[in-house]
Each structure stands twice: as structure tokens, then as C-alpha cells.
Amino acid sequence: MMAENQDRGRRSKWLVVGILVAALSGVAYWFLVANASPDDRPEGTLADIASLRDRDDLNVLFVVIDTLRSDRLSAYGYERGTSPTLDYLSQTGVRFDQHRAQSSWTKSSMASLWTGLYPIRTDVLRHTDAVPEVAVLPAEIFQEAGFVTGGIWRNGWVAPNFGFSQGFDIYQTPAGQQAPASMRSEAKAGRIDGTDIDLVFTATEFLRSNMDERWFLYLHFMDVHQYITTEETAVFGSTYSDIYDNSILWTDSQFGEIIMELYRLGLASKTLIVVVSDHGEAFGEHGAEGHARDLFSEVTLTPFILSFPFRMAQSGVVRSQTENVDVWPTVLDMLGLPGLEEPDGQSRVELLLGRQPTPRLDLGFAQLDRNWGQLEKEESALLAVRKGSLRFIHDVEDPERDLLYDIDMDPAEQRNIKDERAAEVQELLEEAERHLALDPLWRGGSESVEIDEMQMRQLRALGYSIE
């Protein structure tokens, strides 16, 4: 085992070096550096995407990279080469260009991602809330279809007692591995044990153990949230924002280890890869740093990338607005599996295949209770409503602080046009009020769970104030 770990360490070092070369040179085809095998997936077309539902050999790798805003990825046009692995998957797959999460803190966002329901309908809004057992989650659908289901996570907000382990044969935090001596965490608040090296090691063991089975594997990377980087990947500078970019490059290299393992095991040509995030990160664009405080675009614009068991001859870009609630309706539809229970999200497969026009007037919502970590305080709700090019942020406590942006003209949301567009504000306010009046899908709403002192310390170690 020691020799195997040393061999893995050498491979990891060379992969980091190779991806670093790719990042600095602007080369997305990182297979050509890092002593990697050529991409032996066959070439595919839209017709092959439509035919995925007919395959009986397909695996699904579902990757959540925590705290990852899409505009910091070179795959999404960022000027720095932060994400050569994701670049390659995007260039040979499909990228959803205007994609948003449903909240700016993990548990509420992940509840919406897994169920396809908006936060108002999951009722997972506060730190003691949990997804109820009656909910139907994707892992249960895969399990029923005969897949081996595995989940490997490092964020305490997706722990089993919050309802996220439903349907998983294996649902675990990874065992600790030795980290490089040059590794460091620059997180301003909070520090959790381990690194994504641990996750990669455990994921590799899962892939090797189940390479002859059909599997569904969920990986939740955390090193971007923790601002972890190494000497080799600390190439973009030393400000807090620079360190965030460095940590994306580091995490991208670790994700690259998983991709390389798929090739080594002969699984790349029969694996669908889905990459998303739970929320982004702020760097003072609207006065705040971090996340879980507001709903501006820097904390809600997130990636959604699909990589297929074949290389698309031409990369696909879906420019319509999509959301995390659409992810699982899309993936399950693509695979021909049963859908979620009454989701708010919708399958985007037809849109992906070019069979329907761009739905410019689709409504989208994100929600945050600013007092989510303080049970003794009343709810302090923010609701973002997106309709066409307009994005309305409604402060339920104080509507005088409502904001309106034209995200086509002002994607950074720097110019509040509320006073200039009274009719649109009224229309969007009515949409917000209708949305907030919705009932949870499940009778009684979310469950409330007790959090013991050890788990509370672990959650506070993420950097949050919880009372």
C-alpha cells in the first residue's frame, strides 16, 4: 500500500505540473502534457446524446465543486487559465453559459439541487432543517435502476443526518492521506480537516472496486471553499481573490486525477460526467466577502458542464438561462430514467438538442434566509427573481431596499434601475409574492434535526456563525 501511495503521489505531482503548464500556456488539451493517454473516446454528435437513454453500460460521475463561481473559470471565458481540466471537458462536451444556483449557502442550495425544487418548496432554509425521508433523491432512482451508488463528501452541510444520504450504498467522508509539504490553506475563517487529496484517493478506490458494475458516484470537492493551494499552483498572485484562483487551479488538477483514472480503467467511454457547484464567492463586489450573505450574481452564477462518453466534434454552449433545479431533470431525462417528484426545474435536453427556441422569458428564483444560522431570530428573507434580462432582488423585511438589474446590459449588477422601471418592478414583486406563498412539496415541510456539539464544531469550522 505504501508503494502504491508513493506511485500515486508521483503521478499526482506530474499531473499538477502538466496542468500548470496548460494553465500558463493557455493549452486546454492537458492530455498532451502530463504523460497522459490520448483521449480514446469516440467522436459523437447530438444524435449520440439523444441515444444515451438506450445504453445499458453507462455510469454517472456527479461532481460538485464547492464555492465555485463560473466567471472565474477559463472554461467560461476568464482570462486566467484556472481550469484546464474543465476546459477540456467543456470543449469536448457542453457548457451551460448562464447557470445559477438556488441559494448562496450549501445546505439550502444542495437540497434544491438534489430535489429539483426551489428553497421555498424544500423548506430547507435554516441550519437545523433537513430533507425529509419521504423525498425522492436521484441516488434512490439510480439504486432502483441497479446502479452501485456512492457519495464522498467533505462538507458537513451534506451529512447524513440532514437527509442527503438517501439512496446511497456508500456515503462517507474520505480517510486522510498525506498532503504535500507545500500545501497551505488561506481561508480567512474556519478550517476543516483534510484536503481533496483524500477525496481523490477514496474515489479512486471506489472506481477500481466497481469498474465491472454500473455505478453512480457523487464527489463533493472542498478545497476551493478552503482556499487550499500548493506551491506549484500558487501562480496567480497573493491577494485573497488571487488565492481563490490558485485554489481553483489546484482543485482542477485534483479533479484531473479522477478523469485520468477513468481513462486508466477504460471507463471514460462509458461515463457521463456532470459538473456543478452549490454557490459562488464574493470579493467585495457589493461590499461583502464570502457567501451566505446575499444573492448577487457573484454568489449565484455557477458552472454546469456535461461531458459525454464520447467527444463532441464541436463544443456545445447553451446560452439560455438555466438553474440547478434543472440539473437532475435534465440528466435523468437524458438517461431515460424515472424523474424526480414534481420538480420545479425542467429537463433541458430538448433545448440542448436544438429542438426548441431559447426560452428568454423563463422565470428563475434564488432564496436566502439571512438568519439561517440563528434560530432565535425571525426569518430575514431575500428572494431573487430572474425574468428575461431582468433580475429583481426582493428584501421581504424592507422592500425599500429592493434592487433591479438588467443583467444583459449590466452583468456585474452595479447599476440599480428600480426607480427607472416601476412597471417591471411591480410585475416582478407580484411574481416574488406568488412564489413566497407556495407550500413545501412534503406535508409538514422539512424535518428539524438536533445537531450535537461535535457536529456543531465541525460546521463552525467551515467559517460560519451558528447559534
Predicted regions and their residues:
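Catalytic domains that recognize anionic headgroups
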Residues: M2-E467
